[in-house]
Amino acid sequence: MDANNPKKLLDLAVQSLLSHESAALQALEDIPRDLFIPLFIAAFDGGHKDILSEIVKVWPFYCLLFGPLIVQEPQHELLKAMIENFPVCPPKNSASRTPKLRILDLRQDTDCRTTCPEISIKSPFCFYSCTYSDHSIAKIEEQICFENSGSMIQSPRPVELLVDLSLDGSLMEKEFLILLMNKIKESSGSLHICCRDLQVDKLCGCKCTLNFLDLKCVDQFSVDRGSLSDITSVLSRMAHLESLSLFKVTFRSLSGKVFKKFLGHLRRMESLKELNLSSFYLKNNLDRVLRVLPPVLDFLYLPFCDLSYRDFRFLAQCPQASRLKLLNLSNNAMYWDDFEPFNALLGNLSDTLQHLEINHCLIGDSAMSSLIPALIRCTHLRVLGFASNPITMPVLANVMNSLTTLKKLKIVIYPIPVHCYERWHFQGSLDRRKLAIVQLQLKAMLQIAERNDMNWITYTE
């Protein structure tokens, strides 16, 4: 054994504990603090459910963060065991040690560590603790200090459980929600469930679940299928959204009260950085949405929105869309003679745009050729998608020759040239032999341009 290698000694100690579970369970209260983090990681990776359950009870730090740990479906039982054993009430035995763990964060985040560094032992702090909810540790302790000043009353010890939720109606989701509600009941009000990322499939079936969540915490909200009226009711309980994604939303009219209420809620979202409106009919009304958005918008997705020439003209002049990093305008027909508004938009975004998608937009040869000068000015572009547009091989080759000058551009999703189809874009009419020749030609062109780092791919439907 190398006595000069502390990491190796630590690993050996952890493996020794895991190989003798019964002894490890008895020794947890006595092992050094420095051993807890590697023991927790190894126990989770190895599926040691009983040890994880006990680790949560005696965790010697203020917070426990899943951080970079990868959670697969078989490990959901480990998560449930940790939640079940998360100490949310003071110990019944006065001789028992008060648990130190106050914040259990089950979200996956590769940028954070297993626990936050201890800046102050007297005033422990977690960088990821809830800041918006009235039920957060910070707000409750502030209130307790005010109410109990000069009083000897012992107040409940607030704790937080941070989760991302996907409400899809599955059995696993229902079991997880029952577990959370039982834990809230067990805590007698001291547990705050803090959900930051909320994804909902079929909003109409999730109203009861949404009632027990504090939606002030949510900063990422996604709905796949729902009425705008129901969505507006949910948005009224949110205040700090950074990302809003709505797919296949139904509403009666762009001039009705519901749409106006929706715009009113968007106006309040001062922190919004990402907006995704997919299959959201906006023809000739894009200006009404964009005008109420904050100027800090980074990501804008508008596929299947039936955008008009008027909408594109406004988009090119809109300050809210002048600093975008990502723009997705796929499945909006662009068959106009005048492409100047779109060229102007790309010019405005030349300093920031990293990801552009204009797939299925009916962009032909002349339009694509007119876009090349604007595209090559987007020097930060990393991903470009313009698949399923009626482009000929000469124009596709011209696009490739032009784009190879963009050193940051690594991924291009290109359209299959029209000569590869008996009838363009009809299912079953693709000549795969012709496509194979196109792919060989493009590969050779990349090699000549010394851009083997670029990945040109296409879809064969």
Q: What are these model-predicted stretches?
A:
Residues A95-Y301:
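Alpha-solenoid helical-repeat scaffolds
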